[in-house]
Amino acid sequence: MSRIKLIVGLANPGAEYAATRHNAGAWYADLLAERHNQSLKEESKFFGFTARLNLGGEDVRLLVPTTFMNLSGKAVAAMATFYRIPAEEILVAHDELDLPPGVAKFKQGGGHGGHNGLKDIISRLGNNQNFHRLRIGIGHPGDRQKVVGFVLGKPQAAEQRLIDDAVDEAVRCTEVWMKEDRLKAMNRLHSFKAG
């Protein structure tokens, strides 16, 4: 059984970014904390907001970096080093252009796919790509030139509902993973249809 000791929700800091697509990872982390009656509190030595959860009998740290997205690895590496958590026991939730809104998927390893948050985490973990990811679909603007504006934009209401549904199911599936097993959680999440 693959244990998870650190769950990270990627985001840009500040109210102006809170509702943007690039912050989908933080929406997941916030909901996970809320479901377990915890609130994320700022902890400067970890460059982010943190909480401690009990998931399936495991002591799990939750982290939303307050660095900008392209420096996310600074926060992840600080916490992973302090608690001696190997890459294989880290789950990073992030927005995913290659999946449509309403879809979320677990994945282990692989490259960064152009995602600056993942790029920095891989680099700061010593080029270790073996951490788990939760890819939260936000869709693609269709034109590479429009990607930056798209990820820093806010979803339309219908899109937001689909993303929220997928995030909600991802939280439930994270609990299935921790209480039962990863494969069962993956199968359930990957067959989920929002809407």
From Swiss-Prot:
Q: Which UniProt keywords apply?
A: Cytoplasm, Hydrolase, RNA-binding, tRNA-binding
- If you read the UniProt record, what top EC class would you report for this enzyme, in one word? hydrolase
**UniProt site positions, description: Stabilizes the basic form of H active site to accept a proton:** 95
| Active-site residues per Swiss-Prot or TrEMBL entry | 22 (proton acceptor)
One short Pfam family name for this protein?
Answer: Pept_tRNA_hydro
Q: Does the keyword Transmembrane apply?
A: no
What is annotated about its quaternary structure and interactions? Monomer.
Which named protein is this?
Peptidyl-tRNA hydrolase
Q: What organism is recorded for this protein?
A: Erwinia tasmaniensis (strain DSM 17950 / CFBP 7177 / CIP 109463 / NCPPB 4357 / Et1/99)
Q: What is the lineage of its organism?
A: Bacteria, Pseudomonadati, Pseudomonadota, Gammaproteobacteria, Enterobacterales
Q: Which gene encodes it?
A: pth
